[in-house]
């Protein structure tokens, strides 16, 4: 129960009652609102709970006990910035943040390098220099965000880093579910309350620019009812009362309300109307190349503005979906096919296909190539999405009390148009073939044609030789061909396997691991770190050419060699074997070597080959696994998992002809 005095003064309960009275009016027009309000008040008093809350200021080490209803009123009155995880910040007018000034300066630096980069020829030295510098600025900004979660940081706060992460997740989910709704109308309604809330948002809009009759009018409530009932979570298990409520609400709608409900999130029905069909034909008849949705050509600006104005009024539902983070993660998606930390990857092919079949051949004055029309189609969709997301973020930041002058910095930009994307089951691990980057066509053979994210073969521990060869297989045999031929990929991997074996057994270092070795004191257990013991082994045997640490070096994988395996080599290498026996197997770390043997040998960064003494001790199979095994997730995505062979404490992997069907 909630105290009646608390109920009367709570702005949250007042808002709840107002919204519910509007919903009941949809179903029962002319209902006695005073009597209904009395019933709602009784319900909230008898069944509501005003839970306790705690407001904690980590900087000032202050705590204030409160309740949910009082906290809501406090937020409405004080207008703090609302961040993820129930975290609140004072805005920039009330408190100065030096670290925020640093972030803004670094963002300005990044924009400077991005702008200067775009003045250089794509792929030139100057272009790559400024691309690197803008990337460095981004890393510096992200480093500040990460530092806030580190207790040793001077401005450490218990909540800031988590709040930043959750705010980002919240905004990505908000934009992702909005894109999904706009492009494919796929979000489902999980309750009758979801449906009525959607209706209420449409009916409560204060002003519309266009008369509803500019589009084909929907006067039959049954058409609209079928559309919304089919979008309930489990239509086959709908309660009869839910269907009755939807039908009754729609029976009471005016012709205008039915029409506006029908076109909301119904993009393709909207595009099929004569008015919009004609605008799209006019756009294609301009024969204008459209490569950058952030910079619409002057010849298209008026058409795109008109198209957006109609879409914004009739199609866009500019409100947040409830539980959007969970919805985006669990509900079926047809438009947003990938979500990264700060990105939504949108599937534009259905939109392009629609324009091809419905518009391209109606634009009789269009003389563009197929690729130019594809780019035009994709960027029409992306330009609409850009404006839709800007409207959504404006509303979102306003509701979160972000100052208007700061809200513009919260944005999503369109950066890439891809022709193909290969996804893997592992989060944030994918490969794309880039067609356009920030308005510039990426030619075949460009260094940035292939964009690889998160794969092991692109990480620091993998030698550049194997990384380049595996990337080339992806580009030539997966991303460029219209159809992927698995046999060709396996043939390339088989040839690469033979090349690795030949290289390793002949003492070449092309396929060694690449390890970073720090000072031993930097590790909790340096005696078990491969980078440390590999350098120690080299420096012990070859003191005349020592490896200085800290450093990055190539590391040879050995078979876990113990003294009995080294004895046959004593005749040819007596001095080296004696050192190994005395300082390693009988040294201070002898327990480790008795169990594991010699597993790693570092090589100096002078290009020298693997010493002849160690050639028979190289673990060729483990070297193959550590190199080709980094390609495992790529092949698994194509239905060709690696075979595994377990021996002792190692799991060797190799490719066969087994398909995962």
Predicted regions and their residues:
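Conserved acidic
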Residues: 1-661
């Amino acid at each position: 129960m909630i105290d009646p005095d608390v109920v009367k003064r709570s702005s949250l309960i007042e808002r709840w009652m107002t919204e519910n009275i509007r919903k009941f009016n949809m179903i029962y027009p002319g209902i006695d609102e005073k009597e209904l309000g009395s019933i709602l008040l009784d319900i909230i008093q008898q069944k509501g709970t005003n839970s306790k809350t705690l407001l904690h200021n980590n900087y000032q080490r202050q705590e204030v006990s409160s309740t949910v209803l009082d906290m809501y009123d406090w937020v409405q009155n004080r207008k703090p910035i609302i961040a993820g995880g129930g975290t609140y910040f004072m805005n920039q007018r009330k408190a100065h943040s030096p670290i925020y000034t640093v972030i803004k300066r670094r963002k300005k630096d990044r924009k400077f390098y991005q702008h200067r980069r775009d003045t250089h020829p794509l792929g030139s030295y100057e272009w790559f220099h400024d691309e690197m510098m803008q990337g460095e600025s981004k890393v510096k900004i992200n480093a500040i965000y990460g530092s806030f979660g580190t207790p040793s940081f001077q401005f450490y706060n218990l909540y800031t880093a988590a709040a930043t992460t959750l705010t980002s997740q919240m905004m990505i989910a908000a934009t992702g579910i909005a894109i999904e709704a706009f492009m494919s109308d796929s979000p489902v309604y999980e309750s009758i309350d979801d449906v009525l809330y959607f209706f209420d948002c449409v009916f409560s809009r204060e002003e519309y620019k266009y008369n509803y009759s500019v589009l084909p009018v929907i006067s039959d409530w049954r058409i609209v009812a079928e559309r919304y009932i089919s979008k309930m979570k489990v239509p086959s298990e709908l309660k009869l009362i839910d269907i009755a409520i939807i039908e009754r609400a729609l029976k009471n709608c005016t012709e205008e309300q039915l029409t506006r409900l029908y076109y909301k999130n119904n993009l393709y029905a909207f595009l099929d109307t004569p008015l919009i069909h004609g605008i799209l034909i006019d756009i294609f008849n301009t024969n204008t190349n459209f490569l950058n949705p952030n910079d619409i050509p002057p010849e298209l600006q008026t058409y795109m503005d008109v198209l957006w104005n109609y879409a914004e009024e009739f199609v866009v539902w500019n409100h947040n979906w409830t539980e959007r983070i969970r919805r985006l993660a669990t509900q079926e998606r047809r438009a947003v096919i990938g979500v990264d930390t700060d990105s939504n990857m949108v599937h534009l092919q259905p939109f392009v296909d629609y324009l091809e079949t419905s518009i391209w051949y109606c634009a009789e004055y269009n003389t563009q190539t197929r690729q130019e029309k594809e780019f035009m189609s994709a960027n029409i969709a992306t330009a609409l999405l850009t404006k839709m997301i800007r409207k959504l973020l404006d509303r979102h930041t306003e509701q979160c009390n972000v100052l208007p002058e700061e809200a513009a910095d919260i944005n999503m930009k369109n950066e890439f148009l891809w022709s193909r994307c290969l996804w893997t089951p592992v989060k944030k691990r994918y490969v794309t073939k880039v067609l356009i980057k920030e308005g510039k066509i990426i030619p075949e053979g460009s260094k940035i044609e292939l964009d690889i994210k998160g794969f092991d073969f692109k990480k620091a521990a993998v030698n550049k030789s194997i990384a380049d060869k595996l990337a080339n297989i992806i580009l030539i045999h997966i991303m460029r061909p219209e159809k992927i031929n698995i046999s060709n990929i396996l043939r390339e991997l088989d040839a690469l396997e033979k090349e690795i074996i030949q290289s390793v057994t002949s003492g070449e270092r092309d396929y060694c691991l690449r390890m970073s070795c720090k000072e031993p004191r930097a590790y909790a257990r340096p005696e078990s770190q491969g980078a440390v013991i590999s350098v120690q082994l080299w420096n012990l045997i070859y003191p005349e050419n020592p490896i200085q640490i800290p450093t990055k070096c190539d590391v040879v994988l050995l078979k876990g060699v113990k003294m009995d395996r080294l004895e046959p080599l004593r005749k040819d290498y007596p001095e080296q074997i004696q050192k190994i026996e005395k300082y390693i197997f009988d040294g201070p770390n002898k327990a480790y070597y008795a169990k594991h043997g010699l597993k790693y040998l570092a090589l100096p960064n002078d290009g020298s080959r693997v010493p002849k003494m160690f050639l028979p001790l190289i673990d060729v199979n483990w070297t193959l696994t550590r190199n080709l095994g980094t390609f495992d997730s790529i092949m698994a995505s194509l239905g060709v998992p690696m075979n595994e062979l377990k021996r002792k404490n190692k799991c060797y992997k190799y490719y066969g002809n087994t398909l995962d069907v």
